[in-house]
Amino acid sequence: MTPPVKCQVAESNYHGYHGYWASDFTKVDPHMGTLQQYQNFVKEAHEKGLYVIQDIVVNHLGDYQQIKKDISANDFVEGKAKVSESRFYLEPKSVPFSHPEQLPWALNNINDLTYDEWKHNSFYHYNSEISDYTNQTNMYTHSSSNLDDMVTESEVVRNLLRGYFRYWIDKTGIDGYRIDTALYVEPEFFEGFINATDASNMGVREYGKSKGKADFIDFGEAF
């Protein structure tokens, strides 16, 4: 099923009704229903002998930031980024918020971006769209369809995403994940996201097993 997470509703001429423009990974989007309805859906599916596979995104959030050219050290004056409509800026038509609601991404605001934050403490790749699909670094660190690309090589991001997606297993009893845009995330991310056995921060497959789902399913989209 499509991602049920709370999303950016719209930006400019496009809309996030489909569930792939996350704003908060642990809330149900109002137009999808409620958590209780989702729980009932999974329960009824199981009673009919069906598995429920939830679609998820670990590559990007919504389109809150417009980045037309990769941000570089030259874009900072006295330690602060020079916001420019020709290069990078916060999307003014984002609805209902101008930035994600969830940490850590809510901490980064391109309008207040400092050099130190960009260089050492950013949870976004402040780069333009993918330009070379034969270059893995370009694919992993640039945006797909202009959607804000997460720094999935960050341990902070990796640890939080594991927890955010254990949440749905715990709350609803789903049977697996179909991982959207998996081709644009470095393979090392998935080793921990899926298989980590640390009891304090399990990967999603291991967590599924701990909940009695020996066959918890994970597979990715690649195109």
PLM features: what roles do these ranges have?
Residues 53, 61, 185, 200-223:
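Aromatic-lined carbohydrate-recognition surfaces of secreted/lumenal glycan-active proteins
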Residues 53, 176-180:
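Short catalytic-loop micro-motif centered on adjacent basic/acidic residues
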Residues 31-34, 182-188:
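Acidic-and-aromatic substrate-binding clefts and catalytic sites of carbohydrate-active enzymes
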Residues 3-167, 171-172, 192-197, 222:
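Substrate-binding/active-site clefts of carbohydrate-active enzymes
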Residues 17, 48-49, 178, 207-210:
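Short, surface-exposed helix-loop/turn micro-motifs enriched in polar/charged residues
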